[in-house]
Amino acid sequence: LHYFLAGLFTFLLIRTIGAGWVGALLGAVVYSFGGFMVTWTHLPSLISTAAWLPAGLLGVELAFRGRPLRGMLLLALALGMSLLAGHFQIAAYVWLVSLGSGAAHLVYRFAMRRRPGDTHPSPVGPAVALVAAVMLGAGLGAAQLLPSLELSGMSPRGGDRVSPEGYEFHRARALLPIELMTTVDPDFIGSPVRKNYPVWRISYSEHCAYIGVAGAVGVFLALLLGYRRPAVWLYALIGALALWTAMGGLTSYVYYFWIPKVGLAGGFSRLLSVFTLCAAVLAGLGVDALGKRTACSPTSCPPCARAWPLMLVALALTQALPWAYQFNPRTPAGQVYRPTELTRHLTDLANRGRVLEITEPEKWTLFDLPEALLPPNSATVYGYCSVNGYDSLLPTTYRRFADRVQQGIASPAANGNMILISRAFEVPICRYYVSSTPLLGEDELHGAERFRLVYSSAEGYIYEDRTARPYAAWRPDTEARAESAYDWESVQARRLGANRVRLEYIAAETGQCLLSEGYFPGWIASVSGQLQKPKLADETFMQLSLPYGDHRVDLVYRPASVEAGEFFSLLSLMAMIAVAVAARVSRRNCPESRT
């Protein structure tokens, strides 16, 4: 779907600029099957967001080409959908490039209007369209934007600050000059498919700048033959700035230190998304210029006049499609995360307690192939509860807790943002531990009170910690605060969904209930109809005050930021629909307005 959207919007963008269908088709192929879209398919949020970049630029072009209402609606849709797609670094590119293009159009329009006898329309209408699009786009994306802003304030990433050390860290991983050869040959350095990609380089996806031979020829033709078009210079400038920043040039300093938060996200090389699109637009304009230069006239017709542009499109398809299919072969869904005996046991244990997959952090780096027991996010696929995860999606309180357990940094920069706890076996923080090698010998297991071997095979080993605190535990207020996890009594708990938990208990006196659930604002507890907000306890968990008697407690995760975001998103969507319908009705009632 997102390959199609990326290609469709790129095609329409190039056509709107003024190129023919052949050039637009080449540009669509170059972007939708370029290095960024193809190699990031395994992380769908990136390509889902990048697909809206040409839509944003198309909205700007429409706004300045006599269709400000359509341009405003499309730009608002692109800005809002880029936020909803879920990858804020790429969404920032959509916003920056689209609005930067709009600003460039405004400057050009104002400059042209100052020339005597100029007939360009007033820039006021497009300027109003841009402002309205920003407001509607922000409102449309509020369902994702507001909760993410709340999470960033709680996340360990939210408190990060730019620093010279951080800048050098990103520059060391920037695109190298030799890697520019991947623009025409994606496997020039090597390929993970053929398993000859150098282990000393950062991931293949980060540094694949592929646009194809036909795309490169099209860019050259645009600069050689189509230089009279202002659009050629605009997209050449944007593409050059994106590429220079991706290579860690002077502009990367501005990008890192001057653009709030964006520089702290992934590496500079993800600006290849912008470069690839600009190259695609230039390729389309270049082929169009070639077609016009070689067009037949009443008196002469150059050899193969109409064939040259089509030959470039054919070359782009024959080079891009086999490579894309080889890199992302069609695979049955069941083969991606294939169930094994180990994962079946973990799924069976899902309702009994949390699981820690022990992976040594030093074995997980940005350069070496990770030696992990199970792939990241496998707990989500197989349906068990893991205590590992991404530090950008977990609160700072949990990161501090993980660092204390790890007796160091549980998520060092070298392994991205994975929280990998390997020393938790020494303290009872979860019920089950999974490892690729035995954690205890047979003599240590024999007669052990704490650990029990649940499963063992060539895949791995599962141990149960019988002293681990239950998911929900209770103690009366009359007791002194327990130092040990075993002093708490278990409370019957059932998870009714991702955001709902039910507790049932009978107590002879008032007490405190500690839940081994990460504390987030937004949890609301209903204790037999009485609402209560859980409190932060033991660094990262939740605690409730429970009255005596027979009670049922229903916990629901319903943060105000989500409800407010959904309200503003629906309001913006309704406003956009109302504007579109009103414009349609107006055109029907006033036929002369169509001319």
Residue spans of the language-model regions?
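Membrane-embedded helix bundles of polyisoprenyl
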Residues: 3-17, 21-109, 126-148, 315-323
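Transmembrane alpha-helical segments of multipass membrane enzymes and assembly factors
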Residues: 9-23, 59-68, 225-229, 286-293, ...
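Membrane-interface helix-loop-helix junctions at transmembrane boundaries of multi-pass membrane enzymes
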Residues: 110-128, 218-253, 296, 301-306, ...
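Hydrophobic alpha-helical membrane-interfacial segments at the cytosolic entry of transmembrane helices
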Residues: 117-149, 162-166, 235-243, 310-315
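Signature aromatic-anchored transmembrane alpha helix within multi-pass, membrane-resident enzymes
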Residues: 130-135, 281, 287-321
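Periplasmic/ER-lumenal interhelical loops and adjacent helix-loop junctions
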Residues: 137-223, 268, 344, 392, ...
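Extracytoplasmic
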Residues: 158-167, 318-490, 496-508, 518-520, ...
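Active-site-proximal, structured, solvent-exposed surfaces of multi-pass membrane proteins
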Residues: 217, 244, 454-458, 463, ...
